[in-house]
Curated annotation (Swiss-Prot):
Pathway: Glycan metabolism; pectin degradation; 2-dehydro-3-deoxy-D-gluconate from pectin: step 1/5. The chain crosses the membrane at residues 25-45. This is Putative pectinesterase/pectinesterase inhibitor 45. It comes from Arabidopsis thaliana (Mouse-ear cress). The gene is PME45. GO terms for molecular function: enzyme inhibitor activity; pectinesterase activity. It is a single-pass membrane protein. The active site is at 424 (proton donor), 445 (nucleophile).
Length: 609
């Protein structure tokens, strides 16, 4: 069956209906209370704010911890809240507040002060965040000019520089998108765009790191790393400022409409995300009914469809297509390199089964191809979905780094898919990703990257690699503590593949190792078979790298290797309590209501809740 393992949705329909009915009743009561609270709270906030403003006018400003004074400023339109405008003299205090949470305070303060001197006095605290993002953008221009000035005749280095240019362009594009989103937002609703800003700026950090990683170890790479240091510092500061600005705006009295806006915001966000999905398309996500499926294009190797290759179907997709574009891919092995670029958002690919419709390739690092470019399949366009498909890299263990799929599509979903490879099978590169009821197979670091990705109800199989090789399920690559990225393995099974079972004693296997300084991985409510060593986690190349700064955690795992008593004693490892584990569930970690809204099965919280 094409959809043989989809969590028995029908068994949960009645329970889901009851839950939704209860939710409607609760929301109805809450709405009445919110309206009442809005009227009372709005009046109270206004009076309190007026009194507070008068009191602040009588006090001195010699304490940095004092709240900034607010006043009316000339504006083309009335401010939407008391937080909209600030006196020019208060800008320095706000800068200090926003920069206090950063890792590089002097740089943050100098950046914002220099940027504010270039323009009219800042009348909106959000302008300071935009100034920080502009600084990253400008610095990237200068950084890449310096990179281009470096002399090299080595072909690999020249290729790495070319790749770096593409990555810098992607970073600048997402910086531009971030600034536009800030411009288009209302102050009262700034909190609603925070997850997007976090995702985009986290990706900007990843792109810069990938640029450096593209060079072989040596003098040139050291020079490249040095050049990117300034832009990475500025990116880190921008990420830190998002949270502190959100906190600052939330602490300032708002007009009474805020309560009403918040009461309606969840529904509006959901409508915005799913406006391009019809009811029929949502139903399609729950079960593949080939007869009822009416795709925009059909791919079939035997010629029974519109196209015989996936790339041909993508090439025929209309430019700037509005809505979701569905491609049905009939059973067969498709030996082609596929890239769904950023100009193709909202693409859905549906196969006949994860072991029937397979995209395959064999590019590898052993063939002198950089890891980033070895992927058989690349998903970049926002909102990509794949269902009942397989993705392979057949380079084998001798190929070393050989990626089956690289995913950087924001809000991407993979349902009942299969990912097969050895080292570096699944490159969960950037942005928010959700994998449900998938099979992932590999040896070394076979789930790696710097996305915010949750793997739920998946089977993770460790296979036999090269003699003496140690297996690691994950190698998460968070560079900076303010990135909102990390891997969560939730309600999954980690077990030996069939080829490893007879010889598993000869191959030590671990849940993960730290690829980058702030690597973050959580394994919770999962079954861990005895293939995993009791210590659980592996050092990076037998060093102490990142053991103080990483964030590895477990919660209520079972199975022969689920116990944590013998786990590593690193400062960065811990066993979570229930409240802590909740932070890494789909709801808060991926803002996962968008997954539920499109009709995909998903558990937003813990299974033991």
């Amino acid at each position: 069956m094409a959809f043989q393992d989809f969590d028995k949705i029908q068994e949960r329909v009645n329970a889901e209906r009851k839950r939704k009915f209860r939710k409607r009743i609760i929301l109805g009561v809450v709405s009445v209370l919110v309206v009442a609270a809005a009227i009372i709270g709005g009046a109270f906030a206004y009076v309190t704010y007026e009194n507070k403003t008068q009191e602040q006018g009588k006090t001195t400003n010699n304490k940095s911890k004092d709240s900034p004074t607010k006043s009316e400023s000339p504006s083309p339109k009335p401010p939407s809240s008391a937080a909209q405008t600030v006196k020019a003299g208060q800008v320095d205090k706000i800068i200090q507040t926003l920069c206090n949470s950063t890792l590089y305070k002097p740089t943050c303060q100098n950046t914002l002060k220099n940027e504010t001197k270039k323009d009219t006095p800042q009348t909106d605290p959000r302008s300071l965040l935009k100034s920080a993002i502009v600084a990253v953008n400008d610095d990237l221009d200068q950084v890449f000019k310096r990179v281009l000035s470096l002399k090299t005749e080595n072909k690999d280095d020249k290729d790495a520089i070319a790749q770096c240019k593409l990555l810098v362009d992607e970073a600048k594009e997402e910086l531009g998108t971030s600034m536009k989103r800030i411009n288009d937002s209302e102050v009262n609703n700034f909190a609603k765009i925070v997850p997007d800003l976090d995702s985009w700026l986290s990706a900007v950090m990843s792109y810069q790191e990938t640029c450096v990683d593209g060079f072989e170890e040596g003098k040139l790479k050291t020079e490249i790393r040095k050049n990117f240091n300034s832009s990475q510092v500025l990116t880190s500061n921008s990420l830190a400022m998002i949270k502190s600005l959100d906190g600052y705006l939330s602490s300032v009295p708002k007009v009474k409409t805020r309560l009403l806006l918040e009461a309606r915001s969840s529904a509006k966000e959901t409508d915005h995300i799913t406006s391009w999905l019809s009811n029929k398309e949502r139903r399609m996500l729950k079960a593949v009914d080939v007869k009822a499926l009416k795709p925009n294009a059909t791919v079939a190797k035997d010629g029974s469809g519109n196209f015989t290759t996936i790339n041909a179907a993508l090439k025929a997709m209309p430019a700037k297509y509005q809505g979701r574009y569905t491609i049905y891919i009939k059973h067969g092995i498709y030996d082609e390199s596929v890239i769904i670029d950023k100009k193709k958002p909202n693409v859905t690919m549906v196969g006949d089964g994860s072991q029937k419709t397979i995209v395959t390739g064999n590019k590898s690092h052993a063939k002198k191809i950089r890891t980033f470019l070895t992927a058989t399949f690349v998903a970049q366009g926002e909102g990509f979905m794949a269902q009942s498909m397989g993705f392979r890299n057949t380079a084998g263990p001798e190929g070393h780094q050989a990626v089956a799929i690289r995913v950087q599509s924001d809000r991407s979903v993979f349902l009942n898919c299969r990912f097969e490879g050895y080292q570096d099978t699944l490159y969960a590169y950037t942005h928010r990703q959700y994998y449900r009821s998938c099979v992932i197979i590999g040896t070394v670091d076979f789930i790696f990257g710097d996305a915010a990705a949750i793997f739920q109800n998946c089977d993770i199989f460790i296979r036999k690699g090269l003699p003496g090789q140690k297996n690691t399920v994950t190698a998460q690559g968070r560079v900076d503590k303010f990135q909102t990225t990390g891997f969560v393995i939730h309600n999954c099974t980690v077990a030996p593949n069939e080829d490893l079972k007879p010889v598993k004693a000869q191959f030590k296997s671990y849940l993960g190792r730290p690829w980058k300084p702030h690597s973050r991985t959580v394994v919770m409510e999962s079954t861990i078979e005895d293939v995993i060593d009791p210590v659980g986690w592996l050092r990076w190349q037998e060093t102490d790298f990142a053991i103080d700064t990483l964030s590895y955690a477990e919660y209520k795992n079972d199975g022969p290797s689920g116990a944590t008593a013998a786990r590593v004693k690193w400062p960065g490892f811990r066993v979570l309590n229930k409240e802590e584990a909740m932070k890494f569930t789909v709801g808060p970690f991926l803002q996962g209501e968008w997954i539920q809204a499109i009709g995909s099965p998903v558990k937003l919280g813990l299974y033991d809740a």
